[in-house]
A protein has these predicted regions:
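A short beta-strand-to-alpha-helix junction
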Residues: 3, 26-29, 73-79, 258-270, ...
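Conserved small/polar residues in nucleotide/adenosyl-binding loops
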Residues: 481-486
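Histidine-centered active-site microenvironments of extracellular/periplasmic hydrolases
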Residues: 28, 217-233, 281-340, 346-347
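Active-site-proximal N-terminal segment of extracellular/periplasmic enzymes that hydrolyze or transfer
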Residues: 1-44, 48-50
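Core domains of carbohydrate- and sulfate-ester-processing enzymes
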Residues: 111-165, 215-252, 312-313, 318-320, ...
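Active-site regions of oxyanion-processing enzymes, predominantly non-cytosolic
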Residues: 2-9, 110-117, 148-173, 177-235, ...
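Polar, surface-exposed loop/tail segments
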Residues: 30, 60, 106, 174, ...
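Catalytic-site neighborhoods of secreted/periplasmic enzymes
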Residues: 57-178
Length: 486
């Protein structure tokens, strides 16, 4: 009897490739992600086509592009998910998650799974602990007064109060945490391992683990255990775990931004630790030779200027630059040559076809993504010529081997610039200096990409037509061209 094939997808929300050793970070500690890359396949050019959280998961679960048709919406009756396709087959399906957006009322993203387990309390679900009084934590200890004044002057007092109220609700739970194992990612992966220990080995299984970490709040163990941050041990200021979403330099000093990034880095390392716990359990249970393991993320994280982004802190603008749209994905598959680094363009809608192909279900005819098994096995060199990304009704982008093109839709609140092209192979020093002055202020040297914008725009719109895209691309002809900052 053949050993049943199984699949595990582990989602780390808001995981930036810039904070992973195998993606080129030389100072962070991510030994288990690095181990997974050595044992599996690392995808260098994976882009989330529909941003952010919910559209990405819809694409991953259904294998269909979301950007041309819709944004933050519920699953429809016409959507066919991986769990739907497993139904009626001898495949046990389970969802273990702490991402509140996966269970929004009436959205239906948990449908089809045989077993569902949810951990309360993360950002957007913090109200679950509203009734618990704060005893020994004070929310003001985590917000710098000067930064709050700057943010309030720019965004309004009500916006600041809402963020602090959310943070206070989060602290209502965090005040009881005492060890790294109290963090959401630890509890979620421990529950997933519990499922693996109990599942019937004579049947196939599909397990989706959805960790909202390392999404903000960036509250790693050092912040609630009274310890120095291991990546910034000399810091004497406040641990601003819920950064104010704005143009970074308008609110924070560079020293503050550095510490915020180091809190995030510590949380990434904690996620890595629990990835290792999962990998060890898979090996201990003898599942390595029969189980596809995919570590995925929905998007990266804008965190300032230069190498960290285009001037933003968090997703406060719908700008699909590399630091947001590019996501780290590593897959380990039995029978596939380990240690590969694949440069071919891959997208969030490729998850469902890959999982279904591996499980033997076959790629559903409604799926627009591609199974990546032929790519991983070396049977093909690529599955597409370019990638797309963006926010439905706000912005979209196309990424080719040489150029990226970003297009903003008309929206007075979000569109300081409307168009930009980025050359993939050049990062001029003066461009980085311009970004340091202001997130979207760019020098005239960038104009060299102007002739590339129109054909890239045309290619994108033609592609949207093949995906039954809706009419949403009405723009003011305001142009700005820049060299791409990778």
């Amino acid at each position: 009897m053949d050993t049943p094939k199984n699949a595990i997808v582990l989602m780390f929300d808001t995981l930036s490739a810039k904070y992973i050793g195998c993606y080129g970070n030389g100072w962070i500690k991510t030994p288990n992600m690095d181990r997974l890359a050595r044992e599996g396949v690392l995808f260098e050019n994976w882009y989330t086509e529909g941003l952010p959280t919910v559209p990405c998961r819809r694409a991953m679960l259904t294998g269909r592009y979301t950007l041309p048709q819709s944004g933050w919406v519920a699953l429809s009756m016409d959507d066919t998910t991986i769990a739907d396709l497993c139904w009626g087959r001898p495949i046990d399906t389970a969802l273990v998650f702490d991402c509140p957006m996966f269970r929004l009322p009436k959205f239906g993203y948990t449908r089809g799974f045989d077993k569902v387990w949810f951990l309360h309390g993360h950002e957007a679900d913090e109200h679950f602990f509203d009734g618990d009084p704060l005893i020994h934590m004070d929310v003001d200890d985590y917000f710098d007064e000067t930064s709050c004044e700057k943010y309030s002057a720019r965004s309004g007092k009500e916006a600041l109060e809402a963020i602090k109220a959310m943070s206070a609700s989060l602290l209502s739970e965090v005040q009881y945490w005492k060890t790294p194992e109290d963090r959401y990612v630890a509890k979620t992966i421990k529950k997933a391992v519990e499922y693996l220990r109990q599942v019937d080995r004579n049947k196939q299984f599909f397990l989706w683990i959805d960790s909202f970490d390392p999404h903000e709040p960036w509250l790693p163990p050092s912040t609630y255990m009274g310890l120095p941050c291991p990546y910034d041990p000399d810091w004497k200021g406040k641990d601003e775990f819920m950064p104010l979403p704005d143009i970074a330099n308008e609110v924070y000093t560079e020293e503050q931004l550095h510490h915020i990034r180091m809190l995030y880095a510590e949380l990434v390392t904690l996620c890595d630790t629990w990835l290792g716990h999962l990998m060890d359990a898979i090996r201990e249970l003898g599942l390595e030779s029969s189980t596809l393991l995919m570590m995925v993320s929905d998007h990266g994280s804008p965190q300032g200027n230069g190498e960290w982004g285009h001037g933003l802190m968090r997703k406060c603008r719908p700008w699909p630059y590399e630091e947001l749209a590019r996501a780290p994905v590593i897959a380990r598959c039995p029978g596939v040559k380990p240690g590969q680094r694949i440069k071919a363009f891959t997208q969030s809608c490729d998850v469902a076809p890959t999982v279904c192909d591996w499980l033997g279900i076959g790629v559903h005819p409604d799926m627009q993504g591609k199974s990546l098994l032929p790519l991983m096995r070396g049977e093909v060199d690529k599955v597409r010529d370019f990638a797309i990304a963006g926010y439905y009704d706000y912005s979209w982008a196309i990424y080719t081997e040489d150029w990226s093109y970003i297009h903003w839709l008309t929206d007075a609140e979000t569109a300081e610039v409307m168009r930009a092209t980025f050359y993939s192979k050049s990062v001029p020093k003066e461009h980085l200096e311009a970004l340091g002055r202001k997130g979207f202020a760019l020098d005239q040297d960038a104009m060299k990409g102007a002739d590339k914008a129109e054909p890239l725009e045309g290619k994108t719109l033609t592609y949207f037509d093949t995906l039954d895209g809706k009419e949403q691309w009405t723009c003011t002809p305001c142009l700005l061209y820049t060299s791409r900052c990778v």
